[in-house]
Amino acid sequence: FCKVRAEEKITEEMIQDPTLLGYFVDNELPWRKDALVRYLSLDKSDINFQKTLEWTAEEKGLDVESINMDTLKAGLTDEDQSKFLKHIADKYFGIVSKLLKERDPNHLFLGSRLHGQAIRLKPVFEVLGDYADVISINYYHRWTPRISELENWRMWSGDKPFVISEWYVKGEDSGYTNTDGAGGVVKTQVDRGRFYQNFTLGLLESKSCIGWFWHTYRDTKDLPKGSNKGFLSVRYKPF
């Protein structure tokens, strides 16, 4: 599937494009600390349950046929959860990075735009450190970047560079409802500018941050509904 997808999406023109930076392979995949418990709670007919049970049995030296599921799940440790998360992340990123580079060796593999709980999961960063050229992070719910988080990303990934692949804040004075999206809301466009300056100066504190992408070029939808996510209005006018 991944090989066919890469061949369909990545054209010869893209492969030879000197202005193309690289590729995100997905967006905000639901990496979870408790992935092992979640997989073991699936229906027994689900292939994901079956493969997870096989992995768990092998890790713990158990016979699949004699496992009591309630006892097994109750006895899972944080180490078990972490090892499984690293296992599935390695399986996924190992496959997609290999096929991506086979299809286009000229450009960067930029990860999968981590978001939410994923930005606090050490095993995912450890795996991305092995496969990604740059780690992408959709960084929200922060008025100022947390230096401790930026440093964790650097250490966990083995000094792999990261890029903030999505972030923004909306202004109340735009006239939009601003009810959708993860970005915060401030009073005015001047405040948006102050937020931008403060946030980017914070990112520059990290030697591993190589840049950032504001979420959208222009706002989404039209008045009165919509969100002030862009640099320009929906009519392509600067604020």
Give residue ranges: language-model regions.
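Short, solvent-exposed loop/turn and secondary-structure capping segments
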Residues: 33-38, 147-148, 174-176, 224-225
